[in-house]
Amino acid sequence: MIDSSKKQQQQPPQHYSFADILSAGDLDPLKEKEWLDPGSQKSLKEVLQLRLQQRRTREQLVDQGIMPPLKSPAAFHEQIKSLERARTENFLKHKIRSRPNRSELVRMHILEETLAEPSLQATQLKLKRARLADDLNEKIAQRPGPLELVEKNILPVDLSVKEAITVSQTNLPENLDTLSFDEDSSDALSPEQPASQESQGSAASPGEMKTSDSSSPVSNTTIQCQTVSSPLPDFFKPVPTADLTTRSPLSCIVSKPGPALIKQTQPKHTEKPRSKKSKDPKPRVKKLKYHQYIPPDQKGEKIEEEMDSNYARLLQQQQLVLQLQILSQQHSTLTTSRKSYPAPLKSQKKQNTINTTICNGNAGAPPAQCSVNRQNSVPCKKTGPLPSSLDDMKVAELKMELKLRGLPVSGTKMDLIERLKPFQDFSSNGVSPSSANTVNITNPACNTTDDATTAFSTSALINSSSPTPSVSIGNNQTMLDGINSPLPMSPTPSEQSNFSSEDTNITDTFAEILTMMSPSQFMNTSPLKVNEDSMGATPGNTPNVELDAVEKDRKLQEKEKQIEELKRKLEQEQKLVEVLKKQLELEKRGQQQQPCSNVLLKMEPKHFNLQIKEETEAPDCQNSKQPVGSGGQILGQATAATISQNIIANNAVVIKHEVPLAKPEHQNVIQQFYVTSQRPPQTAVVAQPQALLATQTAQLLLPLSIKAANGVQLSMVQAQPHTVNPAPAQLSTAAATTTTLLSAPPKQSAPPTQDKFTPHLLNQNQQIRKLCPSATSGNVFSYPQNPVTAVPQSFSASISTSAQPQRSTQLTAVQNGPTSLHEKSSTPPQLQQFIVQQHPLFSSPTTKSKDPPRYEEAIKQARNNPASQPEVSNAHSQQMDDLFDILIKSGEMSPLIKEPSPISKMRPVTANVTTMPVNTVVSRPPPQIHMAPPLSLESTNSLSVSLESQLEAFLDGTLPSGNNIPHLESNSDDRETFSLIDDLNNDLLQNTAMLEHESTPMETTDTPFTANSCLSLDLADANLDNMEWLDLTMPNSSSSLTPLSSTLPSMFSTDFLDSNDLHLHWE
């Protein structure tokens, strides 16, 4: 194996031509060697390719010690192999040295003490084995039968069975030597063997009935029928009713069914072809008797050998014992289940007898001749009701009761009481342990209208509530009598000596029917034909099947109640959602001065759980009012696809609707939805007043307006090296600013109600907005940019705090800012920058920690995938929105006045990287690739103030006094806002201890801003309790930005010299 593998490795992978494989002297090899035809050449190539495919990998060879591992040198591997060989050699040498000599082996009786030659010893050993085999065969042939074992008290049976055996021994035929048998060597435990030979025995013999144990040794089967040798396809021939009524009852106590193998016998006579099976020329496979060998050329011949009297007597005794067991089981079944018989069986006597005669006569045997041979009767012992207390009974009485019920009598008194307790319970409740019922089936093979009664006795579980059914085939009536047995019911009927070769089809049908019947079909009257005083029936008793049905009905009712409760809860939740929707619409209508289209929420109970929390106005903004507009949101087909990929379970989404405040002069609005995924394994959002926080699983989206002479329209593209979603999303927008961000509802540990909803559609009918191409797929929220006129709440009051751990999934991508593509305006577009952060949790699992692509490559990827959706995960940008709303409200920032112009193409805007520390941001995103439109497009409005200089001055604490800043109208809470801004400036500029990243102080670089520059805010990745630094990148348009991977441990090296230090050093 090792050599072959080495040869396989040495084989070159390329295929040589056959001219190269053959010797160089053959100039025309294919003509001279005719065996190298094209077919053989192809087969050799296939063989070579198969060998190359099947050779073991290097890992397997390393595991098997054939090749050295990659991590260790080859010399070390060879040294290890040599050491192992030396150790094995030493071990073998030691064993050889320490082995005992021949005298020691003779003394230990391992070797025989003889001086004979080895060949002679082998001959003697063969002779000894042959002699032992002969002795064994003789003992097997003369082994005692079950009757002899019972007589010698070797087999434990009941007294009644012993009496029946002694009585029935007088009827044994004396001319058994003239009979010949053909026996299967596979014993009676294989019910698959078809009884392909019609065997007919003498009518005067009660023991020639061939029965067998089916797959369970307890479920024995008797068939009451009289067969007539006829080529008709009828399985059963009619049995006159007079025969059943004139037979003397033979009743005996049930014997314990033993698991011993009982050989299966068949008297063999002339074989008549009655079906296709018997006409099949194939010989029977299992025809060997014991160790008899039949050569293959003689297997098709019919070999009839006479058996000795010992073997015939053995088989006859087996038949007789099996019959007695079957009769005893039937009797015990009828005595224990007499209370389940219906009212037409009028007699209630305790003495129960039953016709259990088995008759298998040949063609000319009349019914009277069959019934004459069954005159042997044993007086039946009655099984009365058990007393209330079994403990007071003596052991002998307990054993007698057990014998009457066919149960084992061995064991202690407590064991006996435990065996009798089910009968005591059933007798007190009036319910029998098993019941014999009848079900009718149709046999398509029957052509006659006569009735033949077939009684199959099958086993049922003690204390089982499922009854044993009895079936009838066509007009042939079949009774199944349930017997008490600790084994499960195995309803496969045994083969009978009067079955034809087609009868096994019927037995299979019985087995299927018994396993497929429902308990409701079992409640039929029994068709047993008995004498008038043979059975006692107590009307009004409840059989076990009713108990089972009641239990099933109760379980079904409980399940229906649970379903009704769930439906009721779902309806309540849907009603609550409708009420909240109506309240939201009423608030919009009451506060709205400019008409907007309504918000459509399409509810589906399969995707999310919705909770909308209404919050009142902030205390510092109580005097101001704001009209509420609608933000354009759409989650289309591609969004649903990404939801199905990213969301494993139903996510509970909490939507907290805050009523924001604005000045009454402005018509626009900020709608804020707090979307929270109720997945608990992540850390909670812990926000502080005057702190700018974002969770690890959030994105911070910051819309900034920048005044520029040649303003450009920037849109965000997140380019990552993994899969893209090429489906374009066109989002309808309206004249409103909608900010969707991921946060935790304050002081809320679990949602009180959860309503399921699907991604909802907020239809607006003004503009069509097309998202920029992105390298990752996700759900998209797009927002139109309109003038932001007032801050909704104060900065400290608007921060959400929660102690609940939140886990954000890639639920929706949030995009702030103008992204419309198909509009024409007259003025240059506003420069809009998106600051996006994303945690590695949102990145695709295929993303690996490697150096990101260059900026130019990322732009090429973005251009090559123009139809893919931008994925921006749910943003926790409440704090940033509040910060810039405060700046706008205080007049230090100019609001975005109008919707910028659409663009038909996106072009990249390069950026510089610089770092500005802010001590309150705790998470870092992957970098975003920004694409800008051509600078020649017009916009409806130009901004009057550059946002970069504003933000730089604000962060440096040198905000201008408003000379170049158009202030908005301020209201009564301007003083609070200004004090809040001062506090924020102090926090941003004073805490230098929190500005260190990995124990390295950071320097704040003041970078001049140009007209075409863009602002990018990157947040460091850390835990919630570690306040790290905030990176502000102020790039020039002529430089390039290298994107960052979301899985890197940190973003930059900590010391940058200037703003042109673009090629970052990765840690």
UniProtKB/Swiss-Prot annotation:
Keyword flag Transcription regulation: yes
RPEL repeats: 46-71, 90-115, 134-159
Protein name, entry field: Myocardin-related transcription factor B
Region named Disordered: 175-223, 249-286, 799-829
GO CC terms in record: nucleus
UniProt subcellular location: Nucleus
Species of origin: Xenopus laevis
Primary location: nucleus
Domain observations: The N-terminal region is required for nuclear localization and the C-terminal region mediates transcriptional activity.
Its biological purpose: Poor transcriptional factor which uses the canonical single or multiple CArG boxes DNA sequence. Acts as a cofactor of serum response factor (SRF) with the potential to modulate SRF target genes.
Any Gene Ontology biological process: positive regulation of transcription by RNA polymerase II
Sequence ranges of Basic and acidic residues compositional bias: 268-283
Compositional bias per record (Polar residues), positions renumbered to this chain: 193-203, 212-223, 799-819
Keywords noted in UniProt: Coiled coil, Nucleus, Repeat, Transcription, Transcription regulation
Coiled-coil portions: 540-594
SMART domains with a match to the protein in the record: RPEL, SAP
Gene3D superfamilies named in the record: 6.10.140.2040, 6.10.150.10, SAP domain
An example Gene Ontology molecular-function term: transcription coactivator activity
